[in-house]
Amino acid sequence: MSLLSVVFVALALSADCFAVSIGIACTHTDVKPRIMWRVAGTFGLFQAGMAVIGYYAGLSIADVISSFDHWVAFGLLTVIGGRMVYESVQGEDDQKLVRLDLTRGLGLLGVAIATSIDALAVGLTFSLSETNIGLAALLVGAVSLAVSYLGFKLGNRISHLASRWVGIAGGLILCLIGLKILAEHTLGWDILL
């Protein structure tokens, strides 16, 4: 695969990270750069790591993984997003709105796994096309990190809207990404974002 093709693949893989970063920034007031870099770095590491795992896994397990990866991503994103919507609707003030912290711990781990599952499949295609996995993983990780950080910057700019509605929107974004992944894998739809 050419270097330009790998860059385009990296941009496509980072779309979910971008949307999730916007959602997280919208549900947390004034996300600090340290947190942005931690989450963006985690997304970049998971994207690169999953691509490497997919590359080395090879075709022997491709059918097994592809039979359930979309369900895992859908389930994680829908549960996390649904909980964010529920907490935003139930919350009475800004202090109670964000109980599920997606910037660290299990919350961050869940969204990092869910947004990087597609990179596993892409890693398989890298092995088939004799792509340099070191360079490809570096590009996928770096692009995901940069795009995630930009998502945080954009999310911070719009997070000053009514926080209850922004929390609902952030949760719905996660749910929609889960539905997108499910539709792409089960219905064969090619959805851009």
From Swiss-Prot:
MF terms in GO: manganese ion transmembrane transporter activity
Main location: membrane
Membrane topology: Multi-pass membrane protein
GO cellular component: plasma membrane
Protein name: Putative manganese efflux pump MntP
Keywords per UniProt: Cell membrane, Ion transport, Manganese, Membrane, Transmembrane, Transmembrane helix, Transport
Protein source organism: Dehalococcoides mccartyi (strain ATCC BAA-2266 / KCTC 15142 / 195) (Dehalococcoides ethenogenes (strain 195))
Lineage summary: Bacteria, Bacillati, Chloroflexota, Dehalococcoidia, Dehalococcoidales
Cell compartment(s), UniProt: Cell membrane
Transmembrane parts of this sequence: 6-26, 39-59, 61-81, 106-126, 132-152, 165-185
Protein's job: Probably functions as a manganese efflux pump.
Family affiliation: Belongs to the MntP (TC 9.B.29) family.
